[in-house]
Amino acid sequence: MSNYGVVHTGDVVYTKSPLKANPYGIIKANKGKPGIVSVLYGVYHTRENANADFIQMYFEQDARLNNYLRPLVNKGAKNTLLISDTDALEGEVCLAPTFDEQKAIGQFFDSLDNLITLHQRKYDKLQVLKKAMLEKMFPKNGSSV
């Protein structure tokens, strides 16, 4: 079990895997159930004055995340990210003055994300309907309406 980290709901997780838009990894809050992760992930328990959802929203923009991590991360020969869990916390993060304000901001953006997801599903269903209607109106060669 020493090769794994325990992640609790509300913890902040740093994924030390380079991605196209995030070459230094990503930072997310665990909004789901507790679980375990490999040592390739840095797991952080937030302080009493810091809200995990706010921290995730703070790092939502690729440019801000990359600017935060760039000076802290060294890239290895195989494009691995060489950074200790402690070093990942060395950068400056501008938090809202109070925990309640951070929580409200995090909830606001969560609500927006949920609304976007809802509208995306509606859009996807309308795209399927449009395709079906076009196929019925304009059948392929040799087909009848």
PLM features per residue range, with description:
Residues 1-145:
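Feature detects amphipathic, helix-rich regulatory segments
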